[in-house]
Amino acid sequence: MIGLIIIVVIVLVALLLLFSFVPVGLWISAIAAGVKVGIGTLVGMRLRRVSPRKVISPLIKAHKAGLHLTTNQLESHYLAGGNVDRVVDANIAAQRADINLPFERGAAIDLAGRDVLEAVQMSVNPKVIETPFIAGVAMNGIEVKAKARITVRANIARLVGGAGEETIIARVGEGIVSTIGSSEHHTQVLENPDNISKTVLSKGLDSGTAFEILSIDIADVDISKNIGADLQTEQALADKNIAQAKAEERRAMAVAQEQEMKAKVQEMRSKVVEAEAEVPLAMAEALRSGNLGVKDYYNLKNVEADTGMRNSINQRTNQKDDESPDK
């Protein structure tokens, strides 16, 4: 009796270990769905540290949708770090939309960091990207701001390695600025905003990107400010400041030159005073040496007195002329 109890306990423990190690419920679900999966396959997944549910559940979903996938394909993608369920959903959506998307390509897109399911949905339902206001200056100096709506469709063939939405927005912005800048007058942009769309769309801006541009529509156009007039005003102000600086420089040089001339005048006056101080000494020396007689000395004094008297008369005459009113 005791031996029978031990055998029953061993069997129960074995069954418990089996059910905990092997997802029997998942295996039954797969068999019920018509997916042939062996117990050994599930055990092998456990040994390879693969969650059987994350492989078998997408496999059942794919089988029901009519996709011919294998456990090896799904397990390989799982081990590579991919999202198996999302790739299978993308394959099912692509099949329903009649889009050619092999599992290997979908797996590559998923491993590249792209949302493959969203890409398939964008291929069916295009996405609208709205740009911020982009400013450009027309030839007459008026700044014009334009906002565009870009309708794009995902290009599944270029999802791996193709540029994203930021590149599309940057290229469209560059095209808008170029088109506005080539307009002779800002009114041309206001009257025909569709010219911007046509010009930008004709440049093939979706080259090298993961999208195909379907249309570019100008949503809004605004007049900002007169950049040309502002630049002219700033240039005039700069020229004025330069002229004032040069005038101030010339004035400073003139003042410096005037002060220099005054210093030279004072220097010459000091030399004259110094020379006049030596005249009496020279006359005394001439008298002592006999080169100048007493008579000559008095004649010189008379000439000096006569010259001083004439200068005094001339000064009084000039003062009277200045004080008399003009006739």
Swiss-Prot record:
GO cellular component, as recorded: membrane raft; plasma membrane
Basic and acidic residues: bias regions: 318-327
Subcellular location: Cell membrane; Membrane raft
Membrane-crossing segments per the record: 2-22
Swiss-Prot/TrEMBL keywords: Cell membrane, Membrane, Transmembrane, Transmembrane helix
Stored InterPro entries: FloA
Membrane topology: Single-pass membrane protein
Record carries keyword Cytoplasm: no
Region (Disordered): 305-327
Subunit description: Homooligomerizes.
Job of this protein: Found in functional membrane microdomains (FMM) that may be equivalent to eukaryotic membrane rafts. FMMs are highly dynamic and increase in number as cells age. Flotillins are thought to be important factors in membrane fluidity.
NCBIfam families on file: PRK13665.1
Protein family: Belongs to the flotillin-like FloA family.
Protein name: Flotillin-like protein FloA
Organism: Staphylococcus saprophyticus subsp. saprophyticus (strain ATCC 15305 / DSM 20229 / NCIMB 8711 / NCTC 7292 / S-41)
Gene: floA
